[in-house]
Regions:
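Iron-associated oxidoreductase/ferritin-like identity signal
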Residues: 1-186
Length: 186
C-alpha cells in the first residue's frame, strides 16, 4: 500500500466510525437510555476530532488532500424501529437492544484496532515514522475505548442484562460523559 492509500483507508474508516457513534447515540436516545446516548455522543465528538487531526496531519506533512473512498452506511438501527415510538419499547426489547448495541460497539472497536495496527505496520515498512506515530496514538485511543466497551459489556452481562441495573446507571453515565464533553475531552 502507498501512503495515499493508507490515509484514504483510514479516513473512510473514521467517517464510518463517526456514523456508527451518531447512530448508536440515536439508538440509545430512542430507548431512553441517556447514559449510553451521551457515551456515544462523546465518542462521536472524539472520532470527529481524530478525523480532523488525521486530515490536518496529511495536509501538513504530505501537502495533499486525502482521496475519498465510498463509505457504506452502517445502518445500525433496525428498519422496523422506524415504525414505533419510544412508548412502544418494552423491557425485553430494551434489554436485548442493550446487549446487541454493546456487542456491535465492541465489534467495531476490535475491527478499528486491527485496521490501525495493520496500517501502522504498513507505515513502518514504508519508513514513514512520523505518520506511524500518529497511528500509534490512535491505536492507544481505540484500545482504551475497546476496554471501556468490554468492561461495560461484562458488567452488564454479570447482571444477566438486568433492566433495573441498566436503568440505575444511566444518570451517572450521562453526567460522566457530559462532564467529559465540557472539559478537555480530546
Amino acid at each position: 500500500m502507498t501512503v495515499d492509500e493508507i490515509f484514504s483507508e483510514l479516513a473512510a474508516h473514521m467517517i464510518k466510525g463517526i456514523m456508527i457513534h451518531d447512530q448508536m447515540s440515536s439508538y440509545y436516545d430512542f430507548l431512553s437510555l441517556c447514559g449510553y446516548q451521551k457515551c456515544h455522543e462523546y465518542h462521536y465528538w472524539c472520532e470527529n476530532a481524530s478525523y480532523l487531526k488525521l486530515k490536518h496531519h496529511y495536509f501538513k506533512y504530505h501537502n495533499k488532500l486525502i482521496k475519498e473512498k465510498e463509505i457504506e452506511n452502517p445502518n445500525l438501527i433496525l428498519k422496523s424501529w422506524y415504525n414505533y415510538t419510544r412508548s412502544d419499547v418494552d423491557i425485553s426489547t430494551k434489554r436485548n437492544a442493550v446487549k446487541s448495541g454493546l456487542e456491535k460497539w465492541m465489534d467495531w472497536e476490535k475491527e478499528t484496532k486491527l485496521l490501525y495496527e495493520k496500517m501502522y505496520k504498513e507505515l513502518i515498512n514504508l519508513n514513514e515514522i512520523n505518520d506511524a506515530k500518529l497511528l500509534e496514538d490512535l491505536i492507544c485511543d481505540v484500545a482504551h475505548e475497546l476496554s471501556q466497551a468490554e468492561t461495560e459489556y461484562f458488567n452488564i452481562k454479570a447482571s444477566d442484562f438486568d433492566i433495573e441495573y441498566i436503568l440505575m446507571e444511566q444518570c451517572e453515565k450521562k453526567e460522566k460523559f457530559k462532564a467529559k464533553m465540557k472539559g478537555d475531552w480530546k
